[in-house]
């Protein structure tokens, strides 16, 4: 899809054959993309990364938030000012600074914002509250 819209498949993306049946692909890196392209407008669950060139931090934050989805967002920076601002203003359920955007500790809530979220947060106390039915019972023996 990205290549049909003039994105460049820099590496990966080929289907892999494995002993176990399934749909496996090599991690793909796609460059020369724009915010309007499908690769950047749809939620892709696979080992795919696309690159959108921006001129500065403000444009990067605007591009990151210009999506109907918001599972996770991340920034790589040496600027404490940008790191702090990004954590507060990125419209995502999980925000990482100088870390991968996948994976969180089991004790913290997991979930997205906007169209990336469905139902309550998984993991952490939010999950405990959702999956637990509280009952108070008394017995006089």
Q: Which positions does each model-derived feature cover?
A:
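Short secondary-structure junctions
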Residues: 6-15
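Conserved C-terminal structural/oligomerization subdomain of aldehyde/semialdehyde dehydrogenase
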Residues: 17, 24-141
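Short, ordered coil/turn segments that flank beta-strands lining enzyme active or ligand-binding pockets
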Residues: 5, 20
